[in-house]
Amino acid sequence: MASSSYTSLLVLVALVTAASAQLSPTFYDTSCPRALATIKSGVMAAVTSDPRMGASLLRLHFHDCFVQGCDASVLLSGMEQNAIPNAGSLRGFGVIDSIKTQIEAICKQTVSCADILTVAARDSVVALGGPSWTVPLGRRDSIDANENEANTDLPGFNSSRAELEAAFLKKGGLNTVDMVALSGAHTIGQAQCSTFRARIYGGDTNINAAYAASLRANCPQTVGSGDGSLANLDTTTANTFDNAYYTNLMSQKGLLHSDQVLFNNDTTDNTVRNFASNPAAFSSSFTTAMIKMGNIAPKTGTQGQIRLSCSRVNS
């Protein structure tokens, strides 16, 4: 069984490598030279209006790539959007739809929704003060979505460190450092009370007591009461993309159980310490991991399609 699993992983890595080799940062230079500027403008406007939108677009990209690859399947109405990790919490669809409409007006059926979402994730990080990176382009859009895979493959807010590592390794090419670096995306954004209630009411011992008490003020213990109340994932610089997430973990101020397990007398502690003390190391590792994640099983060539509307397949 172990040998079979290892062989399957090698096959997945080979397929990912082959597909990602067909991507290029210059893919739209001739066919739609205004594409990247249009995406950037749309993201900047959205994040300026609502800083939380930066985290929402970044999360949308993550939830897309972890389910059958970076193919914009998460943007299709229903299906993956109804999966337990996504229902009632994914945001940013309107921003992507608006950008797609603008691009269709200048380059009809040329730029994929998958590429728009991937670039928008990068531009969201930059808009909130984070690092930039070169995005390989040329992804095509899926013609289906997979709710079951979304339920099984997306890491949960109560995941253990081992479960997180398994989820990332399963995607081919992502390692433990990538996992810790990508978790640093929680330096921006918010989470609902229902995702951290158990942690602040005695479910976890590795939480700062004063921090837990402050969270209880807006997150009642009773299930069904205040479930949607929001708290910042980063308690210090919520709307700035920096390395404060890691210093928070070292103070036992990780909002989610799946955050704090990264610094809990375990194998990832040293990586957290490194990112907390060295912002450049975090930025470098994060951008590397984002490129690797963006290269998970892209559809290229004649695979899939270029959707006219991101929320539905072409008729």
Curated annotation (Swiss-Prot):
Glycosylation, residue list: 158, 265
The keyword Disulfide bond is annotated on this UniProt entry: yes
GO biological process: hydrogen peroxide catabolic process; response to oxidative stress
Binding site residues for substrate: 155
Residues at the active site: 63
Residues the entry annotates as binding Ca(2+) 1: 64, 67, 69, 71, 73
Enzyme Commission number(s) from the entry: 1.11.1.7
UniProt keyword Signal, yes or no: yes
Binding annotation for Ca(2+) 2: 187, 234, 237, 242
Disulfide bonds: 32-107, 65-70, 113-310, 193-219
Uppermost EC category: oxidoreductase
Binding positions (heme b): 186
Gene3D superfamilies, sorted: 1.10.520.10, Peroxidase, domain 2
A GO-annotated cellular component: extracellular region
Domain of life (superkingdom): Eukaryota
GO MF entries: heme binding; lactoperoxidase activity; metal ion binding
Family, similarity comment: Belongs to the peroxidase family. Classical plant (class III) peroxidase subfamily.
PANTHER family: PEROXIDASE (PTHR31388:SF280), PEROXIDASE 72-RELATED (PTHR31388)
Protein name according to UniProt: Peroxidase 1
Species per Swiss-Prot/TrEMBL record: Hordeum vulgare (Barley)
